[in-house]
Structures are given as C-alpha cells and as structure tokens.
C-alpha cells in the first residue's frame, strides 16, 4: 500500500476543497432563477415543417409545440412571417409563402391566418409573440416560380442577383420605403409584442460572387468615398427608419435583431472594442451590419447574437463571444442565441461526461449584461435531445420569468388589481371548473398603462409575503386572465398578485391568505 506524506495529503485536501467550491458555485449559477429573463424560441418556416399538412394539422402541430414550450418556461415566440418577400399572414402587399402551402401565392385552404392565430395562442399562454421578418431576401434557390404579385415579377429592377439568391437592393430608397410599408401593415393589423429581424443583411460572401451595386454607388455616394462605408450606411438608414416607424405606430412593440455571432475579428487576437478573438465571417465587414452602432444609437430594443458554436471551437469560441457581447454590446438588453442540437452534440471540455448546456448557462447567467437566451429552434426544444428541454424545465426555467424591463419605452407601472378573492367556478365552455383566485382588472386610460398579464406569488405559512425586484423563488405563474386555478390544498398559504403592463412593469402587490 502506498504511503502518503503530509504534503501529499494537504495537496489532495486542497484539490478536494477547490472542487467542492467550484461545484457549489457552478450549481448556484445554474440553479439561480432570475425574476426577469427573456426565454425565447424561434419557430421558422424555412425548414419545411409546414409542407404537406392541412391548416388543421398545422394548428394542431403548432399548438402542441406551444404547450410544450410553455411547459419548458419559454416566454416569447419569434414567429417567422416573411422569408423571401412573401407572407405567412393575410397580406395585400405580398403573396402567400410557398413555405406554408407549397406554392407561392396560394392561400391556405380554409383561409387561415397563421400570424393572427399565433398571436392569440401565444397570448393565451402568457407568451410574447414577435413577428420575424427578413428585410432583404427576395428569392432563394428553392423557389422555382414566383407569384404574379411578387416583387421579382412586378419590379425585378429593384433586386440584384447574388449567386442563386435575389436580394432587395439596399441602396434603393424605394426598397426601404416598401419594407417599412410591409412592417407598418403588420403593426397596424396584428397585436404583436415585437418585430424581429435575423442575420441576413447584405448577402453572406460566396466565392466567385460580387455585389453588383457599383453603379448605384457612383450615382449616389452621399459623400462616401468607401463603398463599404456606403453599404453600411444603407443598412443603417433602414434600421433607423424601422425604429422610428415602430415608435410612431405602436410604441410598445419591441424592435429586436438576432445578428450573426461575430461582430468583427480582433486585429490582435484578443477581445477588444474592435472585435473578438475569432476568425470567422464578420457582421461589420462582410454583411455590412454595424450592430454596435445600432445599439449605441438606441435604434434597437434588444439583440440576440446567434452564438451557435461550442465552447472550445477555435474559430469562434462560445465563451469568447459571450464575453465579448457582454463587454461591448450591453447598452440594450442582450440575449444569447443558443443552438440546441449543437450544444448537446459536443462534450463539455471541463467534464467530457456531459454536454455543454450546463457550462453555457452557468456562463450566461454569470454576466451582468446578459438578460436571457433564445433557442434555435423551437422544435429542437420540443424533441428534447440530450434532455435539453428536461433541464430547462427542472433547472434553468423551474420558475416563470417576467420580461426584462425597457424603461426607455415605458417605466410607469400599472395600477394594482382589485377585489382579490377566492372564487368557485362551475363547469363552463371556456374555463376549467375548480377553485380560483380571482381579481378585478385595474382601470387604465392609455394603452401602455393597461394590464395585459398578471404575476402570481405563493408564500408558505409563516413566510413574510414580501416581493423583491430580483427574487423569483415565490413566483408560481404568469397568467393572461384575471384568475388563477388553485391546485391541491393551499390552506394557510398567502397569495400575492401583481398586474403587468405591456412592458411588464409591475404594479403594487395585493395579497390574500387562504
């Protein structure tokens, strides 16, 4: 038997102590439940999940997805409604999407409006619904024929070819006006909570291809001598115009963007304001998207960089990039775009026995400017690879979460609820029978002051029913109707209810002891 001296014993004790401290801190970071956190998921049309299904089958599939996502703590859906100058909603401006019915311009058989339906279904579940559009892509390789009212048929001169893509020419003011017209139509007709754009601006670089806009640059350089600066300004103008439009039409709608995960590559190989320690495609230089400028100018309300790579990936390390966005792009709420399937395929460098979800969430929740995440993609969460959804349900989203505050839009809390009481409900068509907490919706004259949701807290006998801005330990539900179904024996418990407005400013509490 090997004998260990005092030095070896001390060394092993030190290692064990360090491991226990690490494990404690690691678990604390993982299990901490923020009271406010964006927990989104993208529902895309471009993966073909809608094709070959009837509207009834689609509604059933999406309803099941929403139920599962809600159970996993997701509180916002980013729903793709414009993929290539088309519409997954009833529009007089653009044709129905081929991603919905298989043929561009063909309406759903029963006249279904997916966006109107999605808004209603999200709100039933107290989830936000953000309309997700692409402002520049007009046609992809998979679209063999366009509808007679598609922009490629009516105004092909406003598009340019890049590889197998047709792109709205960002240099043309008429295209910016048209995009804003499409957005205004959505805002005026649908009760969306957000307007969302993804990572497609100028096209991703393709070998052997060049952007055919030199004639536009020579004709109207607007004082720029660099075509790269001019291209960035073309996009800047649109982003500012969309911001101004949203604030004018529906000021409570959040305007957010999910850019590619790399802003710029650092010239010295270290994270700095100039860029991250990465070696990949760049927003600034390749897509002509100056993300940092947009948040500094306050043209966007949130950012979701798509950091789909893994910890330890040499070209674009997740850990390096999350730190960079936290350090240099935190002027607006910052959420991290997570790739579910990639996360569970790669082993954690610190613990090869598990995948990377634990370390990614520990890092995300340890940084002060990161206020949530968004899952790519919703169906992947539902499918639960590597128990990803199970971990959301049991660990990271164990408690509900309010949305991060946006005081530049509105910071006035709604009035508190009235007449909080116990109510016994008999069987009805629209309400499950049972014993409810019920209350009266507070009065409001302005849209921004109206209560749209309610937070319900529960305190055990002997606990002081006090709310704090950061404590979610007693938050049991966020509901859209002025009632909450009580489960089991709640005798002796104290319930607290607050009203939430569109920006989820929280009213003063009202409590009742059972």
Predicted regions and their residues:
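Solvent-exposed loop/turn segments flanking beta-strands in beta-repeat/beta-sandwich domains
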Residues: 442-470, 509
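Active-site neighborhood of glycoside hydrolase catalytic domains
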Residues: 174-182, 188-277, 281-307, 312-331, ...
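Aromatic- and acidic-residue-enriched segments that line the glycan-binding/catalytic groove
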Residues: 87-102, 137-163, 199-222, 268-279
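Substrate-binding cleft of secreted/luminal carbohydrate-active enzymes
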Residues: 288-314, 330-409
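Pro/Thr/Ser/Gly-rich low-complexity, intrinsically disordered linker/stalk tracts
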Residues: 387, 391-448, 504-514
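Beta-strand-rich modules
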Residues: 485-507
């Amino acid at each position: 038997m090997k004998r260990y001296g005092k030095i070896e014993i001390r060394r092993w004790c030190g290692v064990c102590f360090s491991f226990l401290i690490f494990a404690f801190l690691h678990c604390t970071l993982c299990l901490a439940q923020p009271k406010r956190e964006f927990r989104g998921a993208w529902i895309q049309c471009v993966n073909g999940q809608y094709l070959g299904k009837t509207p009834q089958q689609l509604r059933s599939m999406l309803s099941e997805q929403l139920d599962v996502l809600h159970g996993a703590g997701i509180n916002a859906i980013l729903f793709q409604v414009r993929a290539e100058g088309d519409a997954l909603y009833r529009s007089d401006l653009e044709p129905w999407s081929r991603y919905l019915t298989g043929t561009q311009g063909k309406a759903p058989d029963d006249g279904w409006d997916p966006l109107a339906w999605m808004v209603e279904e999200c709100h039933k579940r107290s989830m936000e619904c953000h309309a997700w559009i692409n402002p520049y892509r007009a046609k992809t390789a998979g679209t063999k024929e366009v509808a007679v009212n598609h922009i490629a048929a009516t105004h092909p001169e406003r598009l340019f070819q890049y590889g197998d893509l047709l792109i709205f020419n960002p240099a043309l003011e008429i295209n910016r006006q048209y995009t804003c017209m499409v957005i205004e139509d959505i805002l005026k007709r649908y009760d969306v909570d957000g307007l969302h754009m993804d990572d497609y601006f100028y096209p991703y670089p393709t070998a052997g291809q060049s952007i055919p806009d030199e004639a536009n640059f020579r004709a109207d350089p607007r004082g720029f001598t660099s075509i790269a600066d001019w291209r960035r300004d073309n996009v800047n103008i649109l982003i500012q115009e969309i911001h101004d439009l949203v604030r004018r039409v529906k000021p409570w709608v959040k305007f957010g963007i999910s850019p590619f995960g790399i802003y710029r590559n650092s010239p010295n190989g270290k994270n700095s304001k100039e860029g991250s320690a990465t070696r990949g495609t760049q927003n600034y230089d390749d897509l002509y998207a100056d993300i940092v400028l947009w948040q500094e100018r306050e043209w966007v309300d949130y950012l979701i960089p798509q950091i789909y790579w893994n910890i330890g990936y040499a070209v674009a390390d997740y850990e390096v990039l999350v730190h960079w966005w936290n350090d240099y792009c935190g002027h607006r709420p910052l959420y991290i775009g997570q790739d579910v399937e990639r996360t569970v395929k790669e082993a954690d460098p610190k613990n090869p026995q598990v995948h990377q979800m634990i370390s990614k969430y520990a890092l995300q929740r340890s940084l002060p400017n990161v206020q949530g995440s968004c899952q790519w993609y919703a169906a992947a969460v539902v499918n639960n690879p590597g128990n990803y959804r199970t971990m959301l349900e049991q660990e990271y989203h164990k408690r509900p979460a309010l949305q991060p505050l946006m005081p530049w839009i509105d910071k006035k809390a709604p009035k508190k609820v009235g007449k909080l009481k116990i109510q016994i409900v008999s069987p009805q068509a629209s309400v499950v029978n049972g014993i409810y907490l019920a209350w009266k919706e507070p009065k409001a004259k302005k849209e921004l002051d109206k209560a749209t949701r309610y937070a319900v807290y529960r305190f055990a006998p002997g606990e002081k029913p006090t709310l704090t801005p950061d404590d979610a330990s007693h938050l049991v539900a966020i509901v859209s109707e002025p009632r909450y179904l009580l489960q089991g024996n709640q005798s002796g418990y104290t319930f607290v209810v607050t009203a939430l407005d569109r920006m989820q400013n929280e009213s003063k509490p009202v409590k009742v002891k059972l």
